[in-house]
Regions:
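N-terminal phosphate/diphosphate-binding loop that engages ATP/GTP or pyrophosphate donors
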Residues: 31-93
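Cytosolic-facing regulatory segments adjacent to core modules
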Residues: 80-93, 97-135
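Walker A/P-loop phosphate-binding motif and the immediately C-terminal alpha-helix
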Residues: 6-44
Length: 257
């Protein structure tokens, strides 16, 4: 029986390294043999494709606009055209596929297109075991229903007081969207040795990713961060996170059999 994909949404304020965490998590699932992985870039300001070393030529947002502003080819209705273009927008790579959502537009007349994109995503998801979504702190695409409710939300944060405020705000948004507390996990990124992380109450971070010069070197060299050495501290930490997530996904599958 086909397993329902396990969806991980990764959120956090700008500058915390959530796109780095997203790309390393995708790479870790590939290393674990969980292929293909579906990578979803749902942050208009993010560059997940660059972190993964691929090129994106169009987004689903622009495709949706196109379906309403351009002439539809003869023999196609808007439903068929959107489905056709959706597959064209998908970037296929080694071990993963990537789709960029683009900037969300207003509702109203776009409700039809949003619903159709949601339908396309549901059909696409059947081909994957894990889906990693690099999303905005406000999680607009999730709140609009285009991406559905994730199985897990990872809040990437700095290990400091400002990080606590971000964690609290994103957690509130997630709760308002109906996400259960047990699905929400904290990831401290760029943790410097000898520093104490902010007190997050009864929560225990699911991962603490150390500050890694290899990540900074990749950024300075403009090379994909997902391709840093396998023994680099950040990559080792995220691989451990991937193991934990795979275990959680397996436990979920047992409950749904």
């Amino acid at each position: 029986m086909q397993k329902h994909p396990f969806t991980i949404a990764i959120s956090g304020k700008g500058g915390t390294g959530k796109t780095t965490v997203s790309s390393l998590l995708i790479r870790s699932f590939i290393d674990l043999g969980e292929i293909p992985v579906l990578a979803v870039d749902a942050d208009p300001n993010a560059n997940l494709h660059e972190a993964m070393g691929v090129t994106v030529h169009e987004t689903l947002g622009s495709m949706r606009e196109e379906a309403f502003t351009r002439h539809i080819p003869p023999g196609m209705n808007r439903h068929d055209y959107v489905r056709f273009r959706f597959r064209q927008a998908l970037v296929e790579a080694n071990g993963f596929d990537l789709v960029a959502m683009g900037r969300p537009e207003g509702s109203g007349c776009y409700c039809f297109a949003n619903d159709l994109l949601s339908e396309c995503m549901l059909q696409l998801e059947r081909d994957y075991r894990f889906i990693v979504i690099d999303t905005e702190a406000g999680m607009e695409h999730i709140s609009r229903g285009t991406l559905g409710k994730p199985d897990m939300l990872l809040i990437v944060s700095d290990p400091g007081a400002r990080g606590l405020r971000t964690i609290t705000r994103i957690r509130e948004i997630a709760t308002q969207l109906g996400l259960e507390p047990e699905r929400i996990h904290i990831v401290f990124n760029r943790f410097k040795s000898g520093t104490a992380p902010v007190d997050i109450g009864n929560d225990t971070p699911i991962a603490i990713i150390p500050d890694d010069p290899q990540v900074e070197a990749a950024d300075l060299a403009d090379t994909p961060v997902s391709q840093i050495p396998a023994d680099s501290p950040a990559r080792v930490a995220v691989l451990d996170l991937a193991h934990k997530i795979r275990h959680i996904a397996s436990e979920r599958d047992k409950k749904t059999v």
